[in-house]
A protein has these predicted regions:
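Short beta-strand-to-loop element that shapes/binds the nucleotide-sugar donor at the catalytic cleft/hinge
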Residues: 55, 128-142
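A structural signal for short hydrophobic beta-strand segments in well-ordered beta-sheet cores
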Residues: 25, 143-145, 197
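Conserved N-terminal catalytic core of the sugar/cofactor nucleotidyltransferase
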Residues: 2-5, 27, 31-105, 114-116, ...
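Conserved beta-strand segments of alpha/beta enzyme cores
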Residues: 24, 73-75, 126, 194-196
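Active-site metal-binding loops of divalent metal-dependent hydrolases
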Residues: 10, 106-108
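N-proximal low-complexity "stem/linker" segments adjacent to membrane-targeting elements
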Residues: 1-4, 10-16, 25
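Catalytic-core segments of class I nucleotidyltransferases/pyrophosphorylases
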Residues: 46, 102, 109, 114-122, ...
Length: 224
């Protein structure tokens, strides 16, 4: 299974750090965020990855290169301006192919095991989402989860972790080159009962602000 790492975002809330560094290259625990993902993908048996880039994207390409030092073969999907998540995926489909792929937000830190996801069979599902307990800044959550099925009901709700196994069919409605968010497509898949998921309760952190970045650094430092 190929992987796609989403790394095209501007990182407005992390300025001024992201005025000089793309968010995926912000250092955490002694290495850039994206390095954690690349190393874990290779360890999970993934051999090919696509990275979408836009803001300061050449810095990411210079750092990762062709991916060989991470044990991966890496290709780049370049966006003149960010196309949002679904738009970025649709733009990258010629590189991803027609089979399901593992989607990872490169600007989050997540210790979920990639190996079972790389081996996951979607069957008739359009996507399989990794969900996490709601962080303070997203207390309302995104989805419910019951018996492995993702919903939008009134039960316990969880936050989408930015990690998923996804079929290219999910973004079929999106025209290449068009800007499009992912959430409406996920909720449409919920309505069709074609979204599965799992709950991950290990270390996950959205590093969208300096405060969250500092919190993650403290958590990692406490382990050493």
């Amino acid at each position: 299974m190929k992987a796609m790492l989403l790394a095209a975002g501007r990182g407005e809330r992390l300025r001024p750090i992201t005025d000089r560094l793309p968010k995926a290259l912000v250092p955490v625990g002694g290495k850039p965020l994206i390095a954690w993902h690349l190393e874990r993908l290779a360890a999970a048996g993934c051999r090919e990855a696509v990275i979408n880039v836009s803001h300061l994207g050449e810095q990411i390409a210079d750092y990762v290169g062709d991916g060989r030092r991470f044990g991966l073969q890496v290709a780049y999907s370049r966006e003149a301006s960010p196309l949002e998540t679904a738009g970025g995926i649709a733009q990258a489909l010629p590189l991803l192919g027609s089979e399901p792929f593992l989607l990872v937000n490169a600007d989050t830190y997540c210790e979920v095991a990639f190996a079972p996801l790389v081996a996951h069979d979607l069957g008739a599902m359009l996507a399989h989402l990794v969900l996490v307990p709601n962080p303070v800044h997203r207390a309302q959550g995104d989805f419910s989860l019951e018996d492995g099925r993702v919903g939008s009901g009134s039960g316990a709700r969880y936050t989408y972790a930015g990690v998923a196994v996804m079929s290219p069919r999910l973004v079929a409605p999106v025209q290449r080159g068009a800007k499009a968010p992912l959430a409406p497509l996920l909720y449409a898949a919920v309505d069709e009962r074609r979204l599965s998921g799992e709950l991950f309760q290990g270390l996950w952190q959205d590093v969208g602000t300096p405060e969250r970045l500092a919190e993650l650094e403290a958590q990692l430092a406490a382990r050493t």
